[in-house]
């Protein structure tokens, strides 16, 4: 497992990801945390989520806060924050489309792991390979609290890997077959709050429990 993550945008095409450090201000982070607290305070008892390869109703969890931006103006504005857009546009260029948004909140001692996966294979309405995920940290993230891990270069050739059941208690209920050598090459994306990462939608990534 590696902790020296790529911060050079010129290496994105080869590595499949890049970190952008200290993108948001302290005021931005404070506002985001307050808005998130409001969402968590109003979490419903049940949610319909995509898990185990199908839509199903489950007990609500803070990892399943999907699509906040159409309902809450703050999250839409955060998605198009000038500095967030600067990072996103540095890779594919200025013509961007927001496909979806998702807040993943991992409570201490209870946060679910996310098994190895490729984002693109879960976005059934999305076609093409010029697709990236922007992942923004509003709390400090490290391996101890379940930061994201990426296996560099696994997007090359844009393989659509077969999904298999995890058989465990995790966010997706599905994973892909990853060799020990691939896991050894994984990089922990440890970031301070306000930093973000951009990764190719085909690159393998996941995270451990908090």
Q: Model-predicted segments: where are they?
A:
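Glycine-rich phosphate/pyrophosphate-binding beta-alpha loops
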Residues: 121-122, 131, 201, 205-210
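Double-stranded beta-helix
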Residues: 141-208
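Short acidic/polar capping segments at secondary-structure boundaries
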Residues: 103-110, 121, 128-130, 137-143, ...
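Residues that flank catalytic or metal-binding motifs in active/ligand-binding sites
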Residues: 71, 99, 130, 144-146, ...
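Non-heme Fe(II)-dependent double-stranded beta-helix
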Residues: 1-15, 20-116, 120-125, 163
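Internal hydrophobic scaffold segments of catalytic domains
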Residues: 25-38, 138-156
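Short, conserved beta-strand element in jelly-roll/cupin
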Residues: 91, 117, 124-143, 190-193, ...
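Short, hydrophobic/aromatic alpha-helical segments in well-folded domains
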Residues: 74, 87, 134-137, 206
């Amino acid at each position: 497992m590696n902790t020296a993550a790529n911060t050079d945008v010129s290496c994105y095409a080869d590595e499949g990801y890049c970190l952008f450090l200290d993108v948001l201000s302290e005021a931005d982070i404070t506002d985001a945390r307050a808005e998130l607290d409001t969402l968590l305070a109003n979490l419903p008892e049940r949610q319909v989520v995509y898990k185990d390869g199908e839509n199903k109703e489950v007990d609500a969890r803070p990892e399943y806060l999907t699509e906040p931006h159409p309902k809450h103006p703050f999250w839409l504005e955060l998605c198009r924050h000038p500095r967030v857009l600067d990072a996103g546009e540095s890779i594919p260029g200025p013509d961007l489309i927001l496909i979806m948004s998702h807040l993943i909140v991992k409570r201490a001692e209870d946060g679910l792991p996310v098994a190895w996966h490729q984002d693109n294979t879960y976005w059934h309405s999305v076609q093409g390979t010029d697709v990236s995920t922007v992942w923004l940290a509003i709390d400090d993230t490290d391996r101890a609290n379940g930061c994201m891990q990426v296996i560099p270069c696994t997007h090359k050739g844009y393989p659509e890997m077969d999904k298999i059941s995890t058989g465990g208690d995790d966010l997706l209920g599905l994973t892909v077959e990853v060799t020990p050598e691939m896991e050894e090459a994984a990089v922990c994306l440890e970031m301070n709050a306000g930093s973000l990462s951009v990764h190719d939608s085909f690159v393998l990534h996941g995270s451990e429990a908090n």
